[in-house]
């Protein structure tokens, strides 16, 4: 039987046993590749039917050896390390309903497969990191003149008002972004359901009762934390407030025990990459979208 004939379509979020196999597969891939094959949203899609993700699976002797997950726009996939170079990755890509395929870590194997299939790289997302002494130096923070700061937990306005202003600031900052832009109240509420989310980790700079910008922190562990999203409202761009906004989050994370901080940034966002490098961040990983 050809590999393509063994592909089955399913929704793993509705099948507990299959979900456990999928999580085990992702763990085994991570152990070999040193990088997660699925992003956070696609991992959530394995357990949350409401996200509407569909899945393609390949099994061998009742063991899950290949998996592709798809939302409306992109596909992510994982192939068990012991079953690579057997046509599974190619078959999953051929069967995927989207043309955009993520290659997290852009491993040598992913690059070789993309080359074989004549796929083109259309997007690159960098993971940058800072740690130890460099982090200590960049975590110094002082409110700019006329500006105050808070978290969502102690905002100077009602929480619902702060959330509405946060949403507006986000959509102004990311009107160009395929995942972070165009958020709705429902989309924000869904994001706040993540098990790691805390109101105290959503930080704001304020000009009176207007949000200058926000810095959303994700704590993977006390030692490893992330600049999850950071953005400036339109009215406050070009005023030198991006640097203190980033430092506010670094100060918060360092105060909560962080020894390493990571972030994701588009590789072609040259000003942002340069600003993070100036703070002491270096590139740790590259994640690529290939088009078939």
Swiss-Prot record:
Acetyl-CoA 2 binds at residues 230-232, 237-243. This is Mycothiol acetyltransferase. Monomer. Belongs to the acetyltransferase family. MshD subfamily. Keywords: Acyltransferase, Repeat, Transferase. GO terms for molecular function: mycothiol synthase activity; protein-N-terminal-alanine acetyltransferase activity. Residues 13-168, 159-292 form the N-acetyltransferase domain. 1D-myo-inositol 2-(L-cysteinylamino)-2-deoxy-alpha-D-glucopyranoside binds at residues 40, 179, 218, 226, 264. It comes from the Bacteria. Catalyzes the transfer of acetyl from acetyl-CoA to desacetylmycothiol (Cys-GlcN-Ins) to form mycothiol. The lineage of its organism: Bacteria, Bacillati, Actinomycetota, Actinomycetes, Mycobacteriales. The gene is mshD. GO terms for biological process: mycothiol biosynthetic process. Its EC number is 2.3.1.189. Acetyl-CoA 1 binds at residues 77-79. HAMAP family: MshD (MF_01698).
